[in-house]
C-alpha cells in the first residue's frame, strides 16, 4: 500500500502448540509524534530501537513486503507502534536469520555450524561456548540499550543484551535448532520453567536465575546427554522433507486483513497458497488489535484492551507484556484495599476538591480477575499521545486517598489505537465488564496539560485536507495518495484503515456535496444580482434595456457573477413588473375617467336615441368632459349607449328567463314527485320481500321447535325467542304476524294428526274387525273402549290429542254406518228391481 507502513505484522495464534491462545499479547509501544524531519538512516535507527525496547520476539512476514520498509519508512508519516520485522536475507539457508516466521514466533537463532559435523547448538537454558561464525553472512545484530538496567528473563524469551556484546534472542517455543544436524529441543533441565507457563511474546514477571545464552560459546554437554540428544538426529534433507508436509502449513491474517501462510517446521512465510493446502482460509479470523491502554496508578504497568474484548498487562519501562496479573499490581491493589478498610468511616481528603478531579482506584476484585476480565477502559485519541490525559476518580465506597496516592494516580495515562474498520464513539464513555470490580477510568486535569485534537476533530481536519487538495469524486486511493501523504492532517490519523475508510466515504459523498455547493453558490449569485437590481432601482424604469443597464452597472462584481442569459432574464423580469405597474395605473386612471364621463351622461338623461354630434355640443363646458382625452370621449359615449341597449335587452331577457325558470321549477317538482313514488314502490316491494323471508325463517323455526299440536302461544313464545339465529326477533315481522303463523302451524299439526288418525281407523276398523265381538257383545264399531284397545299400539293413536280421539272415532263410525246403510239400501233396491 503506497505511503503506508506495510510491515504491520498480524497477530496469530500458536498453531504449533495446539492451544487456542494468543502467541503473545498485542504489543503496545509509545507513539512517535512525527517523523517528517527524520532522515532515512534515523528512521531505521528508531525502528531498530523500537524493536529492541519492546521486549517482544521478532516477527516476520514475507520478505517481499518487509524488504521495502527502509524505502517506505521515509515516505510514511506514521511510525507503527508495533515492533516491525527486521530486514532479512532473501535466500538464507535453513535456520538462518533470513527464515520467515509468523508474528509472535521467533526465527531460528543466528548460530552457524562449525567444521565439526557433530557440533551441537545452544539450547534454551544452557551455557553456550564460543562458536565459529560464517564470515560471509552477517547475522542480525541487536543494538545495545545502555539506558535501561538488565532484567533477567525466562528461558522462553531473551531480550537484547544490555551490555556491549550483542546476544541472540531465544526461541519462544520448542522448534528445530540449526546446526550440522538439526534436532528438536529435548533434555531441558527440570529446574527451568516450561515455556507454556507464560504467554508467548511476553517476559515473565519474576527473574529466572542461571539462565543465560552467551553467543560465541558451545553448551557444556556431557557424553551421556549428547548421546540422548543425538538420538533423534537426521540430516538436513530429511528435515526439509518434514517441513514440506501439508499439515505444517497454517493460515493467518495480518492487521490489514491480508491472508498469508506459515510453515511451523521450516519457519517460512508466504502470501501464496501452498500446493495442496487443505485448510479454509476464508474462515481465518482477523487477529485482535490493541485499542486502548490505561496506566495503572502507582505502578509502571498499564492495562491494554484489544478490539475483541481481551486485556493484558504491559510495562512501560521494561517493555514487557503479560496475560497474568503482575505482582506489583497485586501488591498495589492490596495496599489500596487495606487503606480503604482502615478509613471507611473517615471523610475524603480535601485534596480531592482542589481541581474538581477524581482519582482512579483499583479494587481487589478487579485486579484478581486478571487482564481478560478487567473492566473496559475509556479510550481517547491515539494521535493525542502528547496530551497524555490524566484522570482521577474516587472509589464508590468513599475511600480517602492521600496526596501520595493522588500523585501516583495522576501518572496514569490513557491512549487509544483506532483499529482498522472500527469507528466508535467510545471516547467519553465508560463500559464495565461483568466482574470488573472497581477498576474505573480517571478524569483529566485540563489545567495541567494541553488538550490535543479529538478523534472527531482529526477526522474533520482529514476531510478538510481532502477538500483543499482537490480530491475529485469517485477518485481512487492509489491515485490521490501522493497528494495527501505529506500533509500533517494525514499523519494525525494513525490507522491506515481509518484513513482509507474516511477517504472512501469522502469520495462517495463529494459529488453530492459539490452539487449542493454549486447550487448554493448559484443561488447566492442570483440573490446578489437581485440586490444589485434593488440598489439600481432609481435607474430602472419600464423603458430600461439590457445595454443601458450594463453600461452603468457592468463593472459590479454582482453583475459578472452570473451568466448573461440569467442577467437578461432577471432584468427583464424587473422591467416587466414595472411595465405592468405602469399599465395598471394607466388603466385605473382611464377607468375612473370613463366612470365620471358615463355618470355625466346619465345625469343629462341621454337615451339610446340621442346623437353624439348634438350631445357633445351641450357638454363642452363640463369639467368631466374636458378631463377625458379627445379620442376617448366618443368611445365612452358609445359604450354608454351600448350599456343602455344591453340593459333594455336585459330586462326582456330577464323576463323570459324568469318564465323559463318557473316552468323549469314546475317540471322539477313533477319529476321529484314521480321519483318519490318510485322510491316508495321499490321500498314497499323490498319490505314485502323482507317480510316473506322473515316469515319463511320463522316458519322454519316453528317446524324445528313446535311439534305438539296442543302447544300454546304463551308457553312457546319464550322457547322461540331463545333461538341463536334470532329468527323470532326479526324487525320485519310484527308480533301479530308471529302469533298468526304460530297458530297456523299448530293447526296444520292438528290436521295432520287427525288425518293420520283417520287413516289408522280405516286400517284398524275393517269389516273383519267389526264382526269380532267381545264377551259382552261389543265390537270396535259400537264400543270406544273396544276400539281403543285395537288402536292404542299404533303411534298415530298417541299423536292424536286425547280429547279428540273419541270424537273422531264416532264420526268415523257414523260415516261407516251411513255408508253401510246406503249400501244395504242399494242392494235391496237392486234386488227388488230384479224381482
Curated annotation (Swiss-Prot):
Domain called WW: residue spans: 243-276, 295-328
Subunit and interaction comment: Interacts (via the WW domains) with the phosphorylated C-terminal domain of NRPB1 (via CTD domain).
Tissues showing expression: Expressed in roots, shoots, rosette leaves, cauline leaves, stems and flowers.
Record's GO cellular component terms: nucleus
Protein name: Pre-mRNA-processing protein 40C
SUPFAM superfamilies noted in UniProt: FF domain (SSF81698), WW domain (SSF51045)
Molecular-function GO term, any one: RNA polymerase binding
General function of this protein: Binds the phosphorylated C-terminal domain (CTD) of the largest subunit of RNA polymerase II and functions as a scaffold for RNA processing machineries. May be involved in pre-mRNA splicing.
Chief location category: nucleus
Keywords annotated in UniProt: mRNA processing, mRNA splicing, Nucleus, Repeat
Bias type Polar residues, positions: 1-20, 400-428
Biological process, per Gene Ontology: mRNA processing; RNA splicing
Annotated spans, Disordered: 1-22, 397-459, 649-677, 714-738
PROSITE patterns listed in its UniProt record: FF, WW_DOMAIN_1, WW_DOMAIN_2
Subcellular localization: Nucleus
Residues in FF domain copies: 455-509, 519-577, 590-643, 691-748, 750-815
Gene3D superfamilies according to UniProt: 2.20.70.10, FF domain (1.10.10.440)
SMART domains: FF (SM00441), WW (SM00456)
Record organism: Arabidopsis thaliana (Mouse-ear cress)
Family as reported in the entry's similarity comment: Belongs to the PRPF40 family.
InterPro entries in the cross-refs: FF_domain (IPR002713), FF_domain_sf (IPR036517), TCRG1-like (IPR045148), WW_dom (IPR001202), WW_dom_sf (IPR036020)
Amino acid at each position: 500500500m503506497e505511503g503506508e507502513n506495510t510491515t504491520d505484522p498480524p497477530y496469530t495464534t500458536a498453531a504449533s502448540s495446539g492451544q487456542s491462545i494468543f502467541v503473545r499479547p498485542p504489543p503496545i509501544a509509545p507513539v512517535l509524534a512525527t517523523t517528517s524531519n527524520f532522515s532515512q538512516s534515523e528512521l531505521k535507527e528508531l525502528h531498530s530501537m523500537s524493536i529492541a525496547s519492546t521486549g517482544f520476539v521478532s516477527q516476520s512476514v514475507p520478505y517481499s513486503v518487509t524488504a521495502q520498509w527502509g524505502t517506505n519508512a521515509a515516505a510514511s508519516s506514521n511510525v507503527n507502534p508495533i515492533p516491525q520485522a527486521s530486514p532479512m536475507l532473501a535466500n538464507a539457508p535453513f535456520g538462518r536469520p533470513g527464515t520467515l516466521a509468523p508474528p509472535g514466533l521467533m526465527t531460528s537463532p543466528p548460530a552457524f555450524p562449525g567444521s565439526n559435523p557433530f557440533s551441537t547448538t545452544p539450547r534454551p537454558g544452557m551455557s553456550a561456548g564460543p562458536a565459529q561464525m560464517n564470515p560471509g553472512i552477517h547475522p542480525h545484530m541487536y543494538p545495545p540499550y545502555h539506558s535501561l538496567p538488565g532484567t533477567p528473563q525466562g528461558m522462553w524469551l531473551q531480550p537484547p543484551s544490555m551490555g556491549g556484546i550483542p546476544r541472540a534472542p531465544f526461541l519462544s517455543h520448542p522448534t528445530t535448532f540449526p546446526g550440522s544436524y538439526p534436532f528438536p529441543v529435548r533434555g531441558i533441565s527440570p529446574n527451568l520453567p516450561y515455556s507454556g507457563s507464560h504467554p508467548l511474546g511476553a517476559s515473565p514477571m519474576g527473574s529466572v536465575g542461571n539462565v543465560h545464552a552467551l553467543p560465541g560459546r558451545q553448551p557444556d554437554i556431557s557424553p551421556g546427554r549428547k548421546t540422548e540428544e543425538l538420538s533423534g538426529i537426521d540430516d538436513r534433507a530429511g528435515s526439509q522433507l518434514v517441513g514440506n508436509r501439508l499439515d505444517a502449513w497454517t493460515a493467518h491474517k495480518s492487521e490489514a486483513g491480508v491472508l498469508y501462510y506459515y510453515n511451523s517446521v521450516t519457519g517460512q512465510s508466504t502470501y501464496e497458497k501452498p500446493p495442496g493446502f487443505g485448510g479454509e482460509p476464508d474462515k481465518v479470523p482477523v487477529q485482535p488489535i490493541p485499542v486502548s491502554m490505561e496506566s495503572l496508578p502507582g505502578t509502571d504497568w498499564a492495562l491494554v484492551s484489544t478490539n475483541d474484548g481481551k486485556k493484558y498487562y504491559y510495562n512501560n519501562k521494561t517493555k514487557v507484556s503479560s496475560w497474568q496479573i503482575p505482582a506489583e499490581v497485586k501488591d498495589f491493589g492490596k495496599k489500596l484495599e487495606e487503606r480503604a478498610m482502615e478509613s471507611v468511616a473517615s471523610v475524603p481528603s480535601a485534596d480531592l476538591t482542589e481541581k474538581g478531579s477524581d482519582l482512579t482506584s483499583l479494587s481487589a476484585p478487579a485486579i484478581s480477575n486478571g487482564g481478560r476480565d478487567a473492566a473496559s477502559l475509556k479510550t481517547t485519541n491515539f494521535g493525542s499521545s502528547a496530551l497524555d490525559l490524566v484522570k482521577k476518580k474516587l472509589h464508590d465506597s468513599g475511600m480517602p486517598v492521600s496526596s501520595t496516592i493522588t500523585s501516583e494516580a495522576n501518572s496514569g495515562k490513557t491512549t487509544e489505537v483506532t483499529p482498522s474498520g472500527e469507528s466508535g464513539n467510545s471516547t467519553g464513555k465508560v463500559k464495565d465488564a461483568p466482574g470488573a470490580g472497581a477498576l474505573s477510568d480517571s478524569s483529566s486535569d485540563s489545567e495541567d496539560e494541553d488538550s490535543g485534537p479529538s478523534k472527531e476533530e482529526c477526522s474533520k481536519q482529514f476531510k478538510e485536507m481532502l477538500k483543499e487538495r482537490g480530491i475529485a469524486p469517485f477518485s481512487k486511493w492509489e491515485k490521490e495518495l501522493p497528494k495527501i501523504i505529506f500533509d500533517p492532517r494525514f499523519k494525525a490519523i494513525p490507522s491506515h484503515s481509518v484513513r482509507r475508510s474516511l477517504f472512501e466515504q469522502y469520495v462517495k459523498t463529494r459529488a453530492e456535496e459539490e452539487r449542493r455547493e454549486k447550487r448554493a453558490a448559484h443561488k447566492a449569485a442570483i440573490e446578489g444580482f437581485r440586490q444589485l437590481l434593488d440598489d439600481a432601482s432609481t435607474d430602472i424604469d419600464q423603458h430600461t434595456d439590457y445595454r443601458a443597464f450594463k453600461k452603468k452597472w457592468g463593472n459590479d462584481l454582482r453583475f459578472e457573477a452570473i451568466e448573461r442569459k440569467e442577467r437578461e432574464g432577471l432584468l427583464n423580469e424587473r422591467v416587466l413588473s414595472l411595465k405592468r405597474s405602469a399599465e395598471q395605473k394607466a388603466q385605473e386612471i382611464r377607468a375612473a375617467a370613463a366612470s365620471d364621463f358615463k355618470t355625466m351622461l346619465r345625469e343629462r338623461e341621454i337615451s339610446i336615441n340621442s346623437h353624439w354630434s348634438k350631445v357633445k355640443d351641450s357638454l363642452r363646458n363640463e369639467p368631466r368632459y374636458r378631463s377625458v382625452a379627445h379620442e376617448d370621449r366618443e368611445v365612452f359615449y358609445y359604450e354608454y349607449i351600448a350599456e343602455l341597449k344591453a340593459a333594455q335587452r336585459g330586462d326582456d331577457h330577464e323576463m323570459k328567463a324568469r318564465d323559463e325558470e318557473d316552468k323549469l321549477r314546475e317540471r322539477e317538482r313533477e319529476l321529484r314527485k314521480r321519483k318519490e313514488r318510485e322510491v316508495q314502490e321499490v321500498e314497499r316491494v323490498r319490505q314485502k320481500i323482507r317480510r316473506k323471508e322473515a316469515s319463511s325463517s320463522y316458519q322454519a323455526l316453528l317446524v324445528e321447535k313446535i311439534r305438539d299440536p296442543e302447544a300454546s302461544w304463551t308457553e312457546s313464545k319464550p322457547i322461540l325467542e331463545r333461538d341463536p339465529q334470532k329468527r323470532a326477533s326479526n324487525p320485519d315481522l310484527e308480533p301479530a304476524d308471529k302469533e298468526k303463523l304460530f297458530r297456523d302451524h299448530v293447526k296444520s299439526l292438528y290436521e295432520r294428526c287427525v288425518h293420520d288418525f283417520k287413516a289408522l281407523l280405516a286400517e284398524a276398523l275393517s269389516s273383519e274387525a267389526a264382526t269380532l265381538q267381545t264377551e259382552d257383545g261389543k265390537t270396535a264399531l259400537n264400543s270406544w273402549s273396544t276400539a281403543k284397545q285395537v288402536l292404542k299400539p299404533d303411534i298415530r293413536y298417541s299423536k292424536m290429542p286425547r280429547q279428540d280421539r273419541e270424537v273422531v272415532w264416532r264420526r268415523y263410525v257414523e260415516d261407516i254406518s251411513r255408508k253401510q246403510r246406503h249400501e244395504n239400501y242399494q242392494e235391496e233396491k237392486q234386488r227388488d228391481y230384479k224381482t
